[in-house]
């Protein structure tokens, strides 16, 4: 039987967004694959000195975890301050991380195909191909194309090499694919959309009422942001958007902010200065509670500076909420051109006005059938069949 290895390096301690996207890709592919699949997770571990300097929390070094009964080994790399300086300050190649990846190559000599996610795993897959002539594909999710390559000359060069060496590059949106072609040319590219878990669906009116009562928002409209409090998410605009909505809308409205990150304190301070504004900071929430949250809200807003294809907009639409956002990345591909706005001087007021329209009269905003894990798995499975059939090992 043919053997396929899947490599990814999303954070095991932050199981949302891209982590959940990869896990679902694996889960649905395993359900239909007629070939053997092994999955490997690469993780950074920051020693005490690195955590102190970077202000990051300690994480537990687990040996493995499970995806639907499939054991996934976790390979830990001890974060190096020297590597960080070389990569992000000097723009040159790492020493220890490069060695860590090179030492993994030999483990894959018996595989027929490598499916990698993002740059580091794509680099490892490229080295495996150079050593054993094993084909590989890379899936790109967002910041690995639109942000990270611009943070270091070496990362830019590495990303370009991986793009060109891959037998196929999958992008989660047409926008991300276009942005990748701005990095370089001469590589094979396809769009492979994220899907949505079956847990995200519209609840019955009675169940929605019960959940809203539990959350204390019965009889109110709810406008929500969900995501990381990072610069790329443009979260510092949220207080201004919320104030504008509150001034325009004549009924009761409350604002939810779900997530965490280094910009949270700044956003909290701005929200606290807004007299009369009703709001709630939820912090990070497990994925299991997000269907309840999205079934309790009326409108999700996402003012991002850039995106690949944000799962939260797909999930919110699947639960029956309306979504408004910036004209950034793959957001328009999901929510429609009439519900996105340029990040110009008029963005805050235009976004607030559209939110109020939706609060006053909910808009039909159906989720397109292409955002489906079954369809994604079918495309990926057919690719695996094609590439393993036409490729001959040396």
Regions found by a protein language model. Give the residues of each.
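Short His-centered aromatic/hydrophobic patch
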Residues: 116-121
């Amino acid at each position: 039987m043919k053997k396929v290895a899947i490599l990814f390096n999303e954070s095991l301690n932050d199981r949302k967004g891209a982590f959940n996207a990869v896990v679902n890709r694996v889960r649905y592919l395993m359900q239909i694959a007629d070939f053997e699949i092994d999955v490997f997770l690469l993780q950074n571990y920051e020693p005490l000195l690195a955590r102190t300097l970077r202000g990051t929390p300690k994480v537990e070094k687990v040996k493995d975890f499970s995806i639907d009964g499939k054991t996934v080994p976790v390979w830990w790399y001890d974060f190096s301050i020297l590597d960080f300086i070389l990569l992000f300050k000097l723009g040159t190649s790492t020493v220890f991380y490069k060695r860590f990846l090179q030492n993994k190559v030999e483990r894959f000599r018996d595989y027929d195909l490598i499916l990698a996610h993002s740059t580091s795993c794509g680099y490892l897959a490229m080295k495996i191909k150079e050593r054993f002539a094993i084909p590989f594909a890379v899936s790109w999710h967002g910041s690995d194309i639109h942000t990270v390559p611009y943070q270091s000359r070496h990362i830019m060069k590495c990303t370009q090499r991986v793009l060109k060496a891959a037998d196929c590059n999958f992008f989660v949106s047409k926008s991300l694919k276009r942005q990748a072609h701005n990095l370089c040319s001469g590589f094979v590219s396809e769009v492979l959309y994220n899907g949505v878990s079956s847990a995200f669906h519209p609840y019955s009116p009675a169940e929605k009422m019960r959940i809203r009562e539990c959350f204390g928002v019965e009889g109110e409209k709810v406008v929500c942001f969900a995501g990381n409090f990072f610069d790329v998410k443009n979260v510092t605009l949220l207080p201004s958007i919320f104030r504008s909505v509150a001034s325009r809308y004549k009924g009761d409205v409350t604002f939810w902010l779900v997530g965490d990150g280094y910009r949270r304190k700044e956003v909290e301070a701005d929200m606290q200065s807004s007299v009369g504004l009703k709001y709630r900071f939820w912090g990070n929430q497990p994925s299991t509670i997000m269907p309840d949250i999205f079934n309790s809200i009326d409108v999700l807003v996402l003012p991002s500076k850039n995106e690949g294809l944000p799962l939260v907009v797909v999930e919110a639409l699947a639960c029956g909420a309306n979504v408004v956002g910036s004209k950034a990345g793959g957001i328009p591909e999901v929510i429609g051109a009439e519900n996105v706005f340029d990040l110009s001087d008029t963005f805050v007021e235009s976004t607030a006005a559209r939110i109020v329209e939706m609060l006053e009269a909910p808009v039909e905003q159906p989720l397109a059938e292409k955002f489906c894990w079954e369809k994604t798995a079918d495309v990926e499975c057919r690719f695996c069949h094609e590439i393993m059939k036409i490729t001959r090992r040396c």
